[in-house]
Amino acid sequence: MLSKNKNITYLKECKICGNTNLKEVLQLNEQYISATFVKSNVDNNLTEIKTPLTLVLCSREDNSNNCGLLQLLEITEPDLLYRQYFYRSATNDTMRTDLKDVVENVTKIVKPQSGDIIIDTGSNDCTLLNFYDKQLSLVGYEPAKNIKYIDEGKNIKIFSDYFNSDQFKKNFKHKAKIITSCAMFY
């Protein structure tokens, strides 16, 4: 299915299980894209871009093995949303506390050892990665080009791009022990 908006593609199947039976749950019509904060609206195309928001459910009616994931039908060009991102995790005490809790909880479960690779996708300013022990191999993927990364002596390897498994395999010999992806689904 094609959109009138060249910045949008549409799901053809469930992102998790591949089911093509997607049932519309909620249609919010066209909305301005989020995270578009600019100095002036004059001659700025980003302030005019809208995208429809349609929630669809991976239907389990015809097959109980389907996953039932609730997801957006429309896929907005990621660069419009993330290349110039305004939010910084470190500026908010609540966010810093929550990210520290994520690290504490995941390390209680997984128990990484010195040298283990830890990846944070959408790592923002690396606040989360800085809560890990410096003996770990810390890797951040962040597509925003306007974010200054915080590296508190942890030697974090930053890729200014979206996560890419081929790029990861080219740069690292071992699988990651922990992969986090906070705030990627809202």
Model feature map: region roles:
Residues 96-115:
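Conserved alpha-helix/loop element of class I SAM-dependent methyltransferases that forms part
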Residues 179-180:
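A conserved beta-strand element that flanks and buttresses the S-adenosyl-L-methionine
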Residues 113-124:
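Conserved class I S-adenosyl-L-methionine
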Residues 2-92:
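N-terminal juxtadomain amphipathic helix
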Residues 137-142:
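Conserved SAM-binding motif I beta-strand of class I
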Residues 125-135:
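Conserved SAM-binding loop of SAM-dependent methyltransferases across substrates and taxa
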Residues 150-152:
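Conserved SAM-binding loop
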Residues 154-168:
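Conserved SAM-binding strand-loop segment of SAM-dependent methyltransferases
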